[in-house]
């Protein structure tokens, strides 16, 4: 997909970001932090890129819990990823948060795969994969740097020509540096998988703008370390609702 082909999608995405400017945050990163959104908040995530687009919704139905569904559409035809789509469903539980609310630990588990983790059999992997990981956030240098680590594991059923069950270790790490204050961050991450389902390691770098606790926009570039099927240029925005999705009333 050429960069110029992104223009209609970018215009739509930016219009949505402006229209809902209050509650916005960008999220095209493979890494995640420990944080669960406040109880009752619904989240809409939109990302457009050269390799794939993403539409994701998250509902914080219980305190410290998130329930997420995501859909990915693909433009690349390499690595067995024809133009098509895959889905992902998962839950996240925030286990621990420090007193300053700048770091903690969570657990995530679900099914489906995002583009950067697809192995040799492409979309066939995504619909047969179950996974778990542990997001960990560590604040450094007086909160000038935030370090996210997310080790995990996955199991893919009916993998390959023999239809065996295949396992993999997944890894993601991300650093966000705030050189001039909390509004602007330089972000970089590395992610991939090793084992019976192996993906080429990728890196992603970009800028993240955080004008308030409710608004963040990010522009990034993604590529493989030893390949040619990286995500390319991406722009993403995350839109938050006021608390409303509560079974027993929102406080």
How does the language model describe each region?
Residues 11-21:
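Bacterial N-terminal signal peptides
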Residues 1-2, 24-25:
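Short alpha-helix boundary/capping segments
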């Amino acid at each position: 997909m050429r960069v110029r082909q992104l223009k209609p999608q970018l215009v739509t995405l930016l219009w949505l970001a402006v229209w809902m400017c209050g509650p916005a945050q960008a999220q095209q990163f493979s890494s995640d932090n420990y944080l669960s959104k406040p109880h009752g908040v619904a989240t809409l995530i939109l990302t457009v890129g050269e390799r794939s687009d993403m539409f994701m919704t998250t509902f914080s139905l219980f305190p410290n819990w998130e329930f997420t569904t995501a859909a990915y559409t693909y433009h690349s035809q390499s690595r067995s990823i024809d133009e098509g789509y895959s889905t992902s469903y998962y839950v996240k539980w925030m286990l621990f948060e420090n007193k300053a609310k700048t770091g903690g630990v969570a657990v995530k588990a679900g099914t489906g795969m995002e583009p950067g983790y697809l192995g040799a059999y492409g979309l066939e992997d995504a619909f047969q994969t179950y996974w778990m990981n542990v997001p960990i956030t560590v604040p450094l240098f007086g909160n000038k740097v935030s370090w996210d680590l997310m080790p995990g594991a996955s199991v893919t059923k009916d993998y390959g020509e023999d239809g065996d069950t295949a396992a993999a270790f997944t890894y993601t790490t991300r650093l966000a540096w705030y050189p001039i204050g909390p509004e602007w961050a330089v972000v970089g991450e590395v992610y991939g998988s090793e084992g019976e389902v192996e993906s080429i390691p990728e890196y992603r770098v970009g800028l993240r703008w955080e004008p308030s606790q409710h608004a963040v926009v990010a522009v990034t570039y993604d590529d493989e370390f030893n390949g040619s099927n990286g995500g390319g240029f991406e722009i993403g925005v995350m839109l938050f609702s006021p608390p409303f999705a509560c079974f027993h009333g929102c406080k």
